[in-house]
Design a protein with these regions (language model features):
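Classical protein tyrosine phosphatase
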Residues: 53
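N-terminal recruitment modules of adaptor/scaffold proteins
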Residues: 1-34, 48, 56, 60-254
Length: 254
């Protein structure tokens, strides 16, 4: 599947690798396709289905392309990792202890089969992402991830080698770390359970990126990660007025 989808219906489609790019072709209409040139790909990111419901190849573009009348800068190919749902409540086995052993064995077999499927899916997607050899494939580091709210809902953000991303819930988030001038950690106060992150870019005409409501437990780890990534950071006890700050920086960048 692809996101965003050029069709109104979601149908499994085919992705082809050509010499100079990637083509997504819908089976519904021959004119329903997405063409992406390798020269226009800024980041090619693979996200495993470990801990997620889908496996993802995400493409972040240098220049937006048109889909219908919409400009898009992110295209994502994904596949659902599981078509099985496991009853995690255990309610189905209540009062059936006589059959419990067999139920457990079935569930164990199901889980093993799902693990096998997920591993095969990860391998397949990773191989596809790497198969053109012209681009470096970035992987997400789940153990370095943290919860935050870049848009309206709480999501799990993860770093790659060069980016900070959120690729599961649209709108997607891709922050290129080399473009970041400074990160401001806002609302860092004793007694508060969370804080906000603001990424200011070297290009002052680019709007800042907010990731709000990050659990305070992630603060020390994120400070260390920013240091490791050579990104300067500063800590503020309040939320700053970024519209005013950015306007003054644009008017007088020096």
């Amino acid at each position: 599947f692809v996101r965003p989808n050029p069709d109104t219906k979601r149908v499994p489609s085919t992705v082809f690798i050509h010499e100079n790019g990637i083509r997504f072709q819908s089976p519904l209409r021959t004119d329903s396709r997405i063409d992406i040139l390798f020269s226009n790909i800024k980041n090619l990111i693979f996200q495993s289905c470990k801990g997620e419901l889908i496996v993802v190849i995400h493409i972040h573009l240098k220049n937006p392309i048109l889909m219908g009348k919409k400009k898009i800068q992110d295209v994502q190919f994904y596949r659902e990792a599981s078509d099985m749902s496991v009853d995690e409540t255990g309610g189905g086995r209540r009062g059936q202890s006589r059959f419990r052993r067999y139920g457990d064995e079935d569930e164990l077999e199901q889980e093993q089969e799902e693990r096998r499927k997920r591993a095969a899916l990860d391998k397949e997607f990773k191989y596809f992402a790497a198969s053109n050899g012209l681009l470096t494939v970035e992987n997400t580091f789940r153990d370095l991830g943290f919860q935050g709210v870049p848009n309206r809902s709480a999501v799990f953000c993860m770093p790659t080698t060069d980016c900070l991303v959120q690729l599961i819930e649209p709108p997607f988030l891709v922050i290129n770390l080399e473009e970041v001038e400074i990160c401001i950690l806002e609302r860092v106060q004793f007694g508060l359970k969370n804080f906000d992150m603001v990424f200011v870019y070297k290009d002052f005409n680019k709007p800042v990126t907010h990731i709000n409501t990050v659990p305070i437990e992630s603060l020390d780890f994120l400070k260390q990660w920013l240091t490791d990534m050579d990104i300067p950071y500063t800590v503020s006890t309040i939320n700053l007025n970024w519209a005013t700050i950015m306007k003054s920086l644009q008017d007088d960048p020096y």
